[in-house]
Amino acid sequence: MFEKVNPAHPDKIADRIAGAIVDLAYSIEPSPKVAVEVLIGHGDCNIIIESSCITDSHKDKILELVKRISKEDNINLNLKCVEQDTNLANNQLKEISCGDNGIFKYIVPSVEEEFLTDVAKAIYTCVPTDGKYVITRMENEETINELYENKESTTEIKVMEEPTYPYSLTICQSNATDVEILRKIPFKLICSVYGISTGRFEQLKINPLGFWTGGLNVDTGATNRKLGSDMGRSVTGGGLHGKDCSKADVSVNIFCMLLGKKYHKNVSASCSIGDKHVNFLIGFDEKNPIPYSESYESIAKAALDYINYVGGFEKFAEWGLLRGDLK
C-alpha cells in the first residue's frame, strides 16, 4: 500500500516554502547552513529559520515566496530567524562533515509506488490543486480465497508464482468532478506502462465524500509531514526538506537513492555527527551485501548536484525522491 500527495497539498506547500528558503540561502552563500520549519494555514504562515546567512532583513523576499507558493495574497507571516548553534557551526568550519546522526536506506520502488506517482503527476498536470491518492494491493488470505474461489484449495493459490492480486485505488482530488478526473487522466496508458490490467482494480473510489475544494483554509500544512509520499518504503527518520546539503537527512538519503538506482539494489547507511566518511551496504537485505564507503564531502556534493538537476530545493520538495518515470 502507498499514499502519494501532490505539490498543492498543504503539507507539500510547507515543504516547497521551506525548499524555496533553502534556495534563497544558496543564492546568498555557496555553502550555507540552514534549517527551516514551516507551519501554514488559515491565513497564517509561521516560519522558524536557523541559518548562517538568512536574517530578518530577508523578510520581504520570504513573504514574496510564501505568497507565490501558497497562492494566498492575504497571509500573515510570523518569521523568526536565529543563528545556527555554535557547536553545530564549528562542526563545519574546516571541512564539510556529517551534520547530524541518522540511519538511512533506499528501497527499490514497488510497482505500486511508481504507478501511483505517475497517476498523481498526470492528474496534477490537468488539475493543479490539492490532491491525495492511495493504492492498496489486496493480498490478504481472505481476498486471495475470494479471487480464486474456483480453485480446489487455498494451498494451490498460495504457491502460485504470480497471483493476480486485485488493487484498491482511491483518488481524492479537489476542484474536480469524478467525470472530469476520468476524462482528463491517461489512466489506461499509465496502467499499460506498468503492465497492470485496468480490470485488476476491484475498487476505484473517486472523492468518497463528494466534490471538495481543499487548500490552506481547510487543512494546515507542516514541513516534512509527508515523508511516506516522498520516500515510500525508504522512510527511516529525519526529513528531506528545509535543510542544506550538510544535513545527512538530505545528502545521505539522496546518495542512498543514487547508489540504489545505479546497482538496482536496496541500500542502507548510518552516520554520526562529525563523521568524515559514511559507510553503506548495497544490497543490505541480500546474502552477500556490498560494502561501500564515501567521503561526506563527496556525498554532499553529489546530493547538491542532484538537487540542482531537478531544479533546486523548492522543485525537489514537490515530489520528493519518488518523482515518477513517465515523461
Label the predicted regions:
Residues T55-I62, T177-I185, N288-E294:
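Short, conserved charged micro-motifs
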Residues I17-A25, K59-D73, P186-S197, S251-Y263, ...:
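Short, non-transmembrane amphipathic alpha-helical segments
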Residues P30-C45, E149-P163, K265-L281:
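Short edge beta-strands and adjacent turn/loop segments
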